[in-house]
Design a protein with these regions (language model features):
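Positively charged, low-complexity intrinsically disordered leader regions
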Residues: 1-29
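Conserved hydrophobic helix-helix packing surfaces used for dimerization/oligomerization
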Residues: 33-35, 161
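Short beta-strand elements in bilobed, periplasmic/extracellular small-molecule ligand-binding domains
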Residues: 35, 57-71, 185-187
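Glycine-rich phosphate/diphosphate-binding loop of Rossmann-like nucleotide-binding domains
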Residues: 40-54, 136-225, 234, 238-247
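Short, well-structured alpha-helical segments in soluble
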Residues: 77-89
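Anion-binding alpha/beta catalytic cores of soluble intermediary-metabolism enzymes, centered on
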Residues: 95-156
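Glycine-rich, N-terminal phosphate-binding loop of Rossmann-like dinucleotide-binding domains
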Residues: 98, 209, 229-230
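Rossmann-fold NAD(P)-binding glycine/threonine-rich loop
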Residues: 106-123, 127, 230-281
């Protein structure tokens, strides 16, 4: 049976360290790192995520602001709110909760957030820095995965690393971070042929496709490390990942559960990025 990688426990340890550094930053500078989260509409899942982000930031001693805007918000109104946050010196990190309602231009919104306040690391400038390995912020989920691997003393250098999923938010940056850690990286997607053959070559398998229990135990190399980024509801409404945990657990050497795996680490990286943004802002004064 696989070793269970407890993301919740790792997140608690990491957040305790962040809280200590936030306190030291406040003592030295007389200000708190500030995070603003903008949410448009009434998406229930988004509301839960925003509530969790607010609580987590306040728990480590940060200043937290949630800007709730109605579903009918226009592009101009949203951009005006972002402009206000952009010039607010109390706010060091700005996050727009995705997805946005369909009538809003997500790309324009993400481009408008200044790179130095882009704590989700979605701005093209920040993604470019990730490509060359010279970054100020890391995308929250991939960086959270890297922290987990480091905490578990899982060697990446020289290992076959397979990432299923090529999104800009998880798949692509995840592959780049594994590459920077000297892994031999393969990215798989919907057009990949003989997927199971590729996944069975992986020493480290990261799955981020948004399909409930898509990867089964017979697709996994015995002893592999399996990181499940997925967050889905099955036909019974139960929370589950992209990996069929029951069959995978019997084959893998280590595996992240859903819930309690990658999710807590994503928010932890957001806190880390917000503190870094505040430190950068102070150093520029």
């Amino acid at each position: 049976m696989a070793h269970i990688i407890d993301g919740k426990k790792i997140a608690e340890l990491t957040r305790a360290d962040i809280a200590a550094r936030v306190a030291a930053f406040h003592k030295d500078n007389g200000i708190l790192p500030g995070l603003a989260v903008v949410i448009v509409g009434e998406n229930p899942a988004s509301k839960v995520y925003v509530r969790n982000k607010k609580k987590a930031s306040e728990d480590v001693g940060m200043y937290s602001l949630v800007c709730e805007m109605p579903e009918s918000t226009t592009q101009e109104e949203l951009m005006a709110k972002l402009a206000e946050l952009k010039s607010d010196e109390k706010i060091h990190g700005i996050l727009v909760q995705l997805p946005l309602p369909k009538h809003l231009d997500e790309e324009e919104v993400l481009k408008f957030i200044p790179p130095e306040k882009d704590v989700d690391a979605f701005h093209a400038e920040n993604t470019g820095h990730i490509m060359i390995g010279d970054y100020q912020f890391l995308p929250c989920t991939p960086a959270g995965v890297m922290t987990m691997l480091e905490h578990e003393n899982i060697e990446i250098a020289g290992k076959n690393c397979v990432v299923i999923g090529r999104s800009n938010i998880v798949g692509k940056p995840m592959a780049m971070l594994l590459l920077h850690a000297n892994g031999t990286v393969t990215i798989c997607h919907s057009r990949t042929k003989n997927l199971a053959e590729v996944t069975k070559s992986a020493d480290i398998l990261v799955v981020a496709i948004g399909k409930a229990r898509f990867v089964t135990g017979d697709m996994i190399k015995p002893g592999a490390v399996v990181i499940d980024v997925g967050m889905n509801r099955d036909e019974n409404g139960k929370l589950c990942g992209d990996v069929d945990f029951e069959s995978a657990e019997k084959i893998a050497g280590a595996i992240t559960p859903v819930p309690g795996g990658v999710g807590p680490m994503t928010i932890t990286t957001l806190l880390e990025n917000t503190l870094r943004a505040a430190q950068m802002a102070v150093s520029k004064k």
